[in-house]
Amino acid sequence: MNEKATLTKYAVTCDKFEPINPYPWNPAPNNEFFEAHFIVENLRDDTLEFEADVTCIADGYQCKEPITPNAMGEELKYTYINKGLKTQGSLCFQVPTDAKEVIIKVGEYIEIKVR
């Protein structure tokens, strides 16, 4: 997977969306946890204030808020990104096991289809 979406201010790549077992959490019945890894690139001529407002949507329904278990790498979070640089991080979403379409929404305008 290497899905990328670009705006004038920044580009977001989701290069991983895989099942994860985030002990000690257990998913709700008929759900499983997925780790989504993101790379955010500043495309502006100055510093970008990036707010990690990320939502997971499965078959038109918003998934529960993301968690950041220790089993993952660094969390994707609010940060400043200098001109020409990137940041990266992961979030973990609880997704219904039978979901046909899963979309990650970053902010208001970026949507990345991950399933």
Stretch-by-stretch model annotation:
Residues 1-115:
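Conserved functional micro-motifs across diverse proteins
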